Amino acid sequence: MGDERLKLEALNILGLFQVLPRLVVFDLDYTLWPFYCECRSKRDSPFLYPHAKGIIYALKDKGVDVAIASRSPTPDIAKAFLGKLGFQSMFVAQEIFSSWSHKTEHFQRIHRTTGVHFKSMLFFDDEDRNIEAVSKMGVTCILVDDGVNLENFRLGLRNFSLNFASPDMKQAE
């Protein structure tokens, strides 16, 4: 499936939901791309999981902001790769730093930068510990085993909609 066709499929999925997140946050390594940045060089040509680009462009087309929350000992390489992929300006926040603290620190910064409440965010990551920590903040979180794809994208939007409809969520908004 080509990028444009994947984007259209992602747009169709977005159209199934009355309530969308205000911000979708992605981890990088093994979520958007199938490698660790620290195992690469800035000279390398990065590549994404097959569905990632279409999903990101569909979100942007629907007016949903996107952000990055990533821990990496080589944030310079991660940022260079985003630039090579043409994504440098796509993200309203890029929290990429080498600290090995919890992802909750990334989300505190994203919240301060964007003003988006945690309950209005959807997060995709490949590590259980990140999902567990960030979900306690009220963010809808989806664990991805083999990168972000249309299936876990649909699941994320479904879970977000269910969380949004809960009485606890309505109080938070």
Where are these regions (language model features)?
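Substrate-recognition element of Asp-dependent hydrolases with the DxDx(T/V) motif
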Residues: 52-82, 94-100
